[in-house]
UniProtKB/Swiss-Prot annotation:
Compositionally biased spans, kind Basic residues: 1-12
Gene, per the UniProt record: Ccdc198
Phenotype of gene-disrupted mutants: Deficient mice are viable without major developmental, morphological or behavioral defects. However, body weight and mean lean body mass are significantly altered in knockout mice. Mice display significant decrease in serum ferritin and high amount of albumin in the urine. Pregnant knockout females subjected to iron deficit diet, result in developing embryos with altered sizes of inner organs and interscapular brown adipose tissue.
Lineage of the species this protein comes from: Eukaryota, Metazoa, Chordata, Craniata, Vertebrata
Tissue and organ distribution: Expressed in proximal tubules of the kidney.
Keywords for the protein's UniProt record, in alphabetical order: Cell membrane, Cytoplasmic vesicle, Lipoprotein, Membrane, Myristate
Signal sequence region: none
Pfam families in the record: DUF4619
Compartments reported by the entry: Cell membrane; Cytoplasmic vesicle
Keyword 4Fe-4S in record: no
Protein name: Factor associated with metabolism and energy
Entries under InterPro entries matching the protein: FAME (IPR029235)
Length: 294
């Protein structure tokens, strides 16, 4: 019964798809609409032919299976074909996102009782450590070092004491000099006031060595002579004091010019008696043998 020759070979009819009369304009974007439309037209045309042949009693021709090459169900295909000369790498056209550094948000931390206790314990521990270190450092000084420190303190105290004494002496000396100047000015004013005022007569300067003619019973002459002797005495006394001070400064015996800072020398200078100034008082004789005897 030949099974192989009983089947009729179907005739394959080549079908050309109908071209649309409208000329399609090339689009700048990706081309996928025209391709999808052609596939739909081909599938509809083949279905109509198959239906007509089944009505006539003939089997439809074998169709080429596009399994693995095209999908069985027609769907829209997206072919990203760049029309311009651009970069074809997908990574360059769609670069990946850069790695971003995420910083933590500074939120206020809730202070709990445990944290407070930890802080207090840390503070107390640090304070106790510092106190222990101080206690350990105290007995580390040796006896020699203690003696040296004590000696340095005593020397510093003596130096301060000597400076205070020097300042006190300088102030006392300046005060004494001011008093002497005031006394000198006062005596000069006294001498100027004690001069007799002349009513158109010439004023005679009286020297202490001169012998003055006077009447023994004239009290005005006696007062005039006494006043002049006192004034001359004060002037001579002040002049001698100034000369003595200048001599002492020239010799370098005054304490503010000395460069020694030893306390023993200062005590010796204090105990040393001051030099006395001898002043002569020349008295004018009130009675003259030659003139008064006549």
């Amino acid at each position: 019964m030949g099974l192989g020759h009983s089947k009729a070979h179907p005739r394959v009819i080549k079908v050309t798809p109908l071209q649309s009369q409208e000329t399609e304009t090339p689009s700048t974007g990706p081309v996928f609409f025209a391709l999808n439309r052609n596939l739909e037209e081909e599938s509809s045309f083949t279905r109509l032919q198959d239906q007509n042949r089944t009505r006539e009693g003939q089997l439809p021709p074998l169709r080429e299976t596009w399994y693995g090459r095209l999908p069985a169900v027609s769907r829209a295909m997206y072919l990203d074909i760049p029309l311009k000369h651009e970069e074809t790498s997908i990574i360059k056209r769609h670069p990946p996102r850069r790695i971003q550094k995420l910083e933590p948000i500074d939120l206020p931390q809730a202070i709990t009782s445990e944290r407070l206790l930890c802080h207090q314990e840390g503070r107390t521990k640090s304070n106790t450590k510092q106190e222990n270190e101080k206690k350990i450092q105290l007995p580390m000084y040796t006896s020699g070092k203690r003696q040296y420190l004590h000696k340095m303190k005593m020397l510093e105290m003596n130096h301060k004491r000597q400076e205070a004494q020097m300042e006190l002496r300088k102030s006392l000396l300046s005060k004494a000099m001011l008093d002497m100047q005031k006394l000198k000015d006062h005596n000069g004013n006294k001498i100027a006031q004690s001069k007799p005022r002349s009513n158109g007569y010439d004023i005679l300067t009286i020297l202490p060595n001169e012998n003055i003619n006077r009447d023994p019973g004239n009290p005005q002459d006696e007062e005039f002579l006494d006043c002049h002797t006192e004034n001359d005495y004060y002037v001579r006394k002040i002049g001698k004091m100034e000369t003595w001070l200048r001599e002492q400064e020239a010799r370098g015996q005054l304490f503010w010019d000395s460069s020694s800072s030893d306390s023993d020398e200062l005590e010796k200078d204090e105990r040393r008696p001051q030099a006395l100034v001898r002043t002569k008082t020349e008295k004018i004789p009130l009675y003259d043998d030659f003139y008064d005897s006549a």
